[in-house]
Amino acid sequence: MGSSKLLVALTLVVMITISYDLFSEIGISAATLVIPTCFENCNATFQDPECNKWCALLAYKDGSCLYPPSEVDDLPPIKRPYIPRCCCNPITLSPPSP
């Protein structure tokens, strides 16, 4: 009975070790799952490339996050122009100054 418990415990330790090695090899860790704070680099060009990965609920095109407006001139959703938005931040960007 005692040896079977030892065998089960040893098997669990080996499985956890193998799983940890696999996750660390493919780059999955708690640090990679944290969404970066992009507010300081949030502009029309998104200077921080890490922020571009987190266009939550937004479209991504040509290096920027885009937000579709609700309705523009009764156009279907596919034909509507997209408005650039900050990644990680729900505020609308102001137009670039000339």
From Swiss-Prot:
Signal peptide extent: 1-19
Keyword flag Disulfide bond: yes
GO cellular component: extracellular region
UniProt-annotated location(s): Secreted
Top-level taxon of origin: Eukaryota
Pfam families per UniProt: Defensin
Family: Belongs to the DEFL family.
The organism of origin for this protein: Arabidopsis thaliana
Keywords: Antimicrobial, Disulfide bond, Fungicide, Plant defense, Secreted, Signal
Protein name: Defensin-like protein 68
Disulfide bonds: C38-C88, C42-C65, C51-C86, C55-C87
GO terms (BP aspect): defense response to fungus; killing of cells of another organism
InterPro entries attached to this UniProt entry: Defensin-like_dom
